[in-house]
Design a protein with these regions (language model features):
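Extracellular glycan-interacting surfaces
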Residues: 1-340
Length: 340
């Protein structure tokens, strides 16, 4: 199998040496990759006897993954977890009740900040073009599950983020007549649209996408792409009770976003390779470079104030000077035939 047959779906380096990536093969099979030498070599570290659908790294050693586990000739939805760089995985079987949740076609969103608990949303598109979503919450100690069936959102979910056990946010891709963000204050039991998120004057109704909310040190950020190909950010400093709109916007239809902390963030305009550093808790955007190498990047992850990584479907790039200069990483994937 050649690298030409695969494409990256995510990349998260956690140190100079160690990091995770996800790839998809032409036959739609997916794999979790791990590197120990700065992205030069990658190993396939999928859980045994599984079909992986979504990976969610936590740190240099630990990661969650969602997929189907093969049990007695049956495929059961499961959450997998590793604390030793993918060498061994353990699993929890989801308490699903509906057949569609056991499919590889299910849409998946995950959120976790540690290895103690995780949120899972399973979604499907109905014939009416609306969506059905089931929410699962797992506390690993005691294997405690909370299940909320058919939550009251009918649009396509682009991300879920919880800032504590009770307060969470779901971001949507939808027609911009009502809110693109929903909030819960009771652990997901009920969800309500946030109606006071500011927008730009003169924006026409159309399809708007709110990206997965980012929460860093009491700064809550919701990156948003308007239908007129205008990218902006909404900020909250009080857990989503009040909101502010970014002073800056970018005219683009494609971006990659990363926040290392509440004080340092980055945006790449994936149409032209422009790199912006965000400081002062979102108040100031500084264009630090423009690099055609970065056209079409969709994943971006900074693990400190200076060092970051980005990828497009085929290539990996890294910076050591807060995004001013970027270098392409020549890589190889070992045992890639495991995907067949």
């Amino acid at each position: 199998m050649e690298n030409n047959d695969i494409q990256f779906t995510s990349l998260q380096m956690r140190t100079d040496k160690y990091g995770w990536a996800s790839i998809q093969y032409a036959n739609k099979k997916q794999a979790i990759l791990y590197t120990r030498n700065g992205g030069v070599e990658w190993d396939v570290v999928n859980p045994l006897n599984s079909i992986v659908l979504f990976a969610y790294p936590i740190n240099a050693r630990s990661s969650w993954a969602y997929g189907l586990t093969k049990t007695n000739d049956d495929l059961l939805p499961a959450i997998f977890y590793t604390v030793n760089r993918g060498e061994r995985w353990s699993e929890f079987i989801l308490p699903v009740e509906e057949d569609w949740e056991k499919s590889t076609d299910v849409q998946v969103q995950l959120h976790a900040t540690n290895m103690d608990s995780i949120w899972i949303v399973l979604s499907r598109k109905l014939a009416s073009n609306k969506f059905e979503h089931n929410l699962y919450y797992l506390k690993t100690k005691g294997k405690v599950w909370k299940v909320i069936k058919n939550i009251s959102i009918s649009d396509s979910i682009s991300g879920i983020t919880f800032i504590n056990d009770l307060i969470g946010f779901i971001s949507l891709q939808k027609h911009y007549e009502t809110s693109t963000v929903f909030k819960t204050i009771n652990g997901g039991e009920s969800w309500h649209p946030i109606k006071d998120i500011p927008s730009l004057e003169g924006i026409n109704n159309g399809t708007t996408m709110a990206y997965k909310a980012i929460y860093k040190n009491n700064l809550l950020v919701i990156p948003t792409k308007m239908n007129d190909d205008i990218f902006l950010m909404n900020y909250s400093f009080d857990k989503g009770n009040s909101w502010h709109i970014s002073n800056e916007t970018i005219n683009t239809s494609k971006v990659a976003v990363s926040f290392f902390s509440s004080y340092y963030g980055w945006v790449i305009n994936s149409e032209n390779g422009g790199v912006y550093q965000i400081i002062k808790k979102g108040a100031k955007w500084i264009k630090v470079s423009s690099n055609p190498l970065l056209k079409n990047v969709f994943c971006l992850h900074f693990f400190n104030r200076r060092k970051g990584w980005a990828c497009n479907k085929k290539e990996i790039f890294t910076t050591k000077d807060r995004g001013i200069t970027w270098k392409k990483v020549v890589y190889k994937i070992n045992n890639i035939d495991k995907l067949v």
